[in-house]
Amino acid sequence: MFQLLRRAHGLCMPSSLYFSRLVNRSLLSKSPTLAKIVHAQLLEAGFVRTTYWGNRCLQLYFKSGSVINALQLFDDIPDKNTITWNVCLKGLFKNGYLNNALDLFDEMPERDVVSWNTMISGLVSCGFHEYGIRVFFDMQRWEIRPTEFTFSILASLVTCVRHGEQIHGNAICSGVSRYNLVVWNSVMDMYRRLGVFDYALSVFLTMEDRDVVSWNCLILSCSDSGNKEVALDQFWLMREMEIQPDEYTVSMVVSICSDLRELSKGKQALALCIKMGFLSNSIVLGAGIDMFSKCNRLDDSVKLFRELEKWDSVLCNSMIGSYSWHCCGEDALRLFILAMTQSVRPDKFTFSSVLSSMNAVMLDHGADVHSLVIKLGFDLDTAVATSLMEMYFKTGSVDLAMGVFAKTDGKDLIFWNTVIMGLARNSRAVESLAIFNQLLMNQSLKPDRVTLMGILVACCYAGFVNEGIQIFSSMEKAHGVNPGNEHYACIIELLCRVGMINEAKDIADKIPFEPSSHIWEPILCASLDLGDTRLAETVAKTMLESEPKSSFPYLVLIKIYEMTWRWENSVKLRYAMNEHKLKSAQGSSKISIESSVFSFEADQLQIHGGHDTCALLDLLSWDSFDQKIHWSA
């Protein structure tokens, strides 16, 4: 092979330039065989014993994964310099030889800043973040001055504010320029990840120069800290300062508009995407689909998706998630199947969305998706397992859900919350309490407000008054969670179910914040059941004051007024309902026939074959009537 190369170049003995080009091309190929051939040629030319060519050949072996050959060559290099040791250290880390790398670092006769940076980045790449930080502190004890690369690595792995402050202080003491975008962007993003918004903002304000990455980090910091309106303000300020946004910027802004249900501003951001040519980016398009969906414009989401020339997993996930958000399980499943026919491979987000969209009449389809989950190896993923359990609980298949629970390792808090709530809603209160007790024994997880809501629901459905009151009373003291509207509503419903209506009203009257109408609903229903129209009227009026656009208190008051012959008040309320365009909630049912799901609402004929069905019922009624006449005769 190399004889041909020599002839092509007209060379009898290759030059240093020839070998330099050859090594560079061989590094791109990553071929172990080619690495050996190049090494042999260097030996033949007498170059390999020089430190420079030994180092280059060492790089070649490590790049091709030939670690044994690399270590043999390392031992053969007579005059090793710091670069030789650094190349070997980096190569060992890159190929996963962690213990060898640690031993080599200890043996190094001299370490420069590159050696320390390689050690830190190597430990980080192997997942040993804490050790990486310790090495940084050791580096300081050896009085090695860190570089901007050191700080950017460290900022990406810090997990506590104290360490973050130390690294920030070291960057200042090391004289890092305020114009250094790499370091200060990394420090700002570090504070964002740690949830210290004020610190991230202070870094941004002290920077002498800012680029689009700086602004992106600021916008994301505002959004993550819950200041989404402020995040949008920063985006428009960025535009005023003529900083050109990138695709990541606009995707963030569209997502923020989605969370705020700001349709008009979201449309402006999408218009900017069109102007800047960002609509070819899947993440931007996915954010747009999600934004329209959450702003109750599902038709626009579908329209945007249908205009796509090519599908990928990000876009399909967004559309399936939109269908799931609007409880369109059939459409989500149909798109899921169609995406696979278009060679779009589902991922964990796809499965989570499509499983979450399935309703109580889609058990057979859910079982099919579960089989595919197992086949593709996603059954071990906690998020997918959570969605599987949620689907089975919704369809009433508690045993199948608990089978998923038993087989899943690495359960997170969302997983535990799902099983507690699922058991509660399927009238398995005793099992729900048992799972809750298992969670309490887990040292790494602590119940949150969702967990406690689930266990209160279990007590409510089962009528466990003592257990419910005990859990509710200990929320703040034992678990550090202040009861919210949903917790008060649940404990009040529990008391009302067992006839303790006065105790329930006492709790409602002592709520330390403005209660929602959901808190008063159980008391209202219980007072109606007991025939206490005076209390029912008082509660209904209270609900009407807090939520004037809810139809339920209107209907209750109308019923009370008609029962007590107060027709004038009843007419006034009916007029007010019409004026506010309020309607009573419609009951609905669903039925699955083969591969289709049909939805039926009360007083609605706009269903599949609705008028034909009613005509057939009329004929059957007449036929039945004729039969009765015939038999009576």
Swiss-Prot record:
Classification of source organism: Eukaryota, Viridiplantae, Streptophyta, Embryophyta, Tracheophyta
PANTHER family reported in the protein's UniProt record: PENTACOTRIPEPTIDE-REPEAT REGION OF PRORP DOMAIN-CONTAINING PROTEIN, PENTATRICOPEPTIDE REPEAT-CONTAINING PROTEIN
Keyword Mitochondrion: yes
Name listed for the protein in its UniProt record: Pentatricopeptide repeat-containing protein At1g43980, mitochondrial
Gene Ontology molecular function, alphabetical: RNA binding
Ranges in a coiled coil: none
Signal sequence residues: none
Pfam families registered for this protein in UniProt: PPR, PPR_2
UniProt-listed InterPro entries: Pentatricopeptide_rpt (IPR002885), PPR_At4g14850-like_plant (IPR046960), TPR-like_helical_dom_sf (IPR011990)
UniProt similarity note: Belongs to the PPR family. PCMP-E subfamily.
PPR repeat residue intervals: 50-80, 81-111, 112-146, 147-178, 180-210, 211-245, 246-280, 281-311, 312-346, 347-380, 381-411, 412-447, 448-483, 484-514
Renumbered residue ranges of the record's region Type E motif: 519-594
GO cellular component, one term: mitochondrion
Keywords: Mitochondrion, Repeat, Transit peptide
Transit peptide (residue range): 1-30
GO BP term, pick one: RNA modification
Localization of this protein: Mitochondrion
Natural source organism: Arabidopsis thaliana
